[in-house]
């Protein structure tokens, strides 16, 4: 909004001219979302605590240390969604189609997560909305997003770019839509599975969002994209502002989510954040890079899939003491803080590997 209001005055005002730069607006988005989180966090947490008598239900079969979390309110993802959306509406170009499509997906996945959290809190169990129902809703929203991208792009690309290789891409044709839906839904649920310990998912999400802030900027810049031999996609640079807002809102949320957590982001936060990262990767044509940068989410998801498959195949045997993987290490006696920090380190490594693909070809 501010960008659109100040745009006519960029040649007459130094301040207005600053808003012409995506990097300036991205930095400002981080400051705004951090500030909003610090200001609204205590108010929202107290409000959620007053509404949720018992807080988020804690699994009885989980690590014993988790019983100390009883009574902690959930739905803290509302803080992340509100601050990110507000900063984006203030600082991004509101004539940009990618901004509106991404915000639509972000909020829609947040609503699904809210429904799930609400069901858990009201029923006082950790099951929530049926898994198939959530997948169906996620699939419908992802399909709508893919159709919008197809319709609004004059010449939509169905190419899947392979990182670390020059000029290597796969033309998926209209199967790309199915693939894109898989990426968005998969990303949403992968982040959801990772969000099992205080602060565990928040920092890797910030790393991933920060990585895609850079990717969006480069892909949307003709000079940089040509230099790095990336697929140039006009107008994607504005997503840098949104990604920067995600970084700031996640760091602001971490202030309250660090162990011992005062609030959980819940499915409201994890499903929406995973979904929006998937959407941005599809728009920027860096779907495989998302799997690399967000490698921690992939590993956590793979551990659940392997556990379930092996359990069914062997009629009761398990590969891990408990899935997702972070619970396995807790069952091995690792302190929660040690698991979280070590997983953060792994996330940094994956982010660096993913970003190196922009240059190493």
Curated annotation (Swiss-Prot):
Q: Which GO terms describe its molecular function?
A: metal ion binding; phospho-N-acetylmuramoyl-pentapeptide-transferase activity; UDP-N-acetylmuramoyl-L-alanyl-D-glutamyl-meso-2,6-diaminopimelyl-D-alanyl-D-alanine:undecaprenyl-phosphate transferase activity
Pathway given for this chain reads: Cell wall biogenesis; peptidoglycan biosynthesis
Chief subcellular location equals: membrane
Query: Which compartment or compartments is the protein found in?
Result: Cell inner membrane
Name of the gene: mraY
Membrane topology type: Multi-pass membrane protein
Q: Which cysteines are joined by disulfide bonds?
A: none
Question: In which organism is this protein found?
Answer: Rickettsia africae (strain ESF-5)
Any GO BP annotation: regulation of cell shape
Biological function: Catalyzes the initial step of the lipid cycle reactions in the biosynthesis of the cell wall peptidoglycan: transfers peptidoglycan precursor phospho-MurNAc-pentapeptide from UDP-MurNAc-pentapeptide onto the lipid carrier undecaprenyl phosphate, yielding undecaprenyl-pyrophosphoryl-MurNAc-pentapeptide, known as lipid I.
Upper classification of the organism: Bacteria, Pseudomonadati, Pseudomonadota, Alphaproteobacteria, Rickettsiales
Among CDD domains, the record links this protein to: GT_MraY (cd06852)
Q: What is this protein called?
A: Phospho-N-acetylmuramoyl-pentapeptide-transferase
EC assignment: the record states 2.7.8.13
């Amino acid at each position: 909004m501010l960008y659109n209001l100040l745009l006519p005055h960029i040649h007459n005002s130094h301040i207005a001219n600053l808003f012409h730069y995506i990097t300036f607006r991205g930095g400002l988005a981080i400051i705004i979302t951090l500030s909003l989180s610090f200001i609204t966090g205590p108010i929202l947490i107290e409000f959620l605590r007053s509404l949720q008598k018992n807080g988020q239900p804690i699994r009885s079969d989980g690590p014993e240390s988790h019983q100390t979390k009883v009574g902690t309110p959930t739905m803290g993802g509302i803080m992340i969604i509100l601050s990110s959306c507000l900063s984006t509406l203030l600082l991004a170009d509101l004539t940009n189609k990618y901004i509106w499509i991404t915000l639509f997906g972000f909020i829609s996945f947040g609503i699904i997560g809210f429904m799930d959290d609400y069901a858990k809190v009201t029923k006082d169990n950790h099951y929530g909305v049926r898994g198939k129902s959530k997948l169906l809703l996620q699939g419908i929203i992802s399909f709508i997003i893919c159709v919008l991208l197809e319709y609004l792009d004059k010449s939509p690309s169905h190419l899947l770019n392979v990182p670390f290789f020059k000029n290597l891409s796969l033309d998926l044709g209209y199967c790309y839509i199915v693939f894109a839906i898989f990426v968005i839904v998969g990303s949403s649920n992968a982040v959801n599975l990772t969000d099992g310990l205080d602060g565990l998912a928040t920092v890797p999400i910030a790393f991933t969002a920060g990585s895609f802030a850079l990717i969006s900027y480069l892909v949307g810049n003709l000079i940089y994209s040509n230099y790095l031999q990336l697929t140039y996609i006009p107008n994607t640079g504005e997503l840098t502002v949104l990604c920067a807002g995600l970084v700031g809102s996640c760091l602001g949320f971490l202030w309250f989510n660090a162990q011992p957590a005062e609030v959980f982001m819940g499915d409201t936060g994890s499903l929406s954040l995973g979904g929006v990262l998937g959407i941005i990767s599809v728009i920027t044509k860096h779907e495989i890079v998302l799997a690399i940068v967000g490698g921690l989410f992939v590993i956590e998801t793979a551990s659940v899939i392997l556990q379930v498959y092996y359990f069914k195949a062997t009629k009761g045997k398990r590969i891990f003491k408990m899935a997702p993987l972070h619970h396995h290490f807790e069952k091995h006696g690792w302190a929660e803080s040690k698991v979280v920090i070590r997983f953060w380190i792994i996330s940094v490594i994956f982010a660096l590997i993913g970003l190196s693909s922009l240059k190493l070809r």
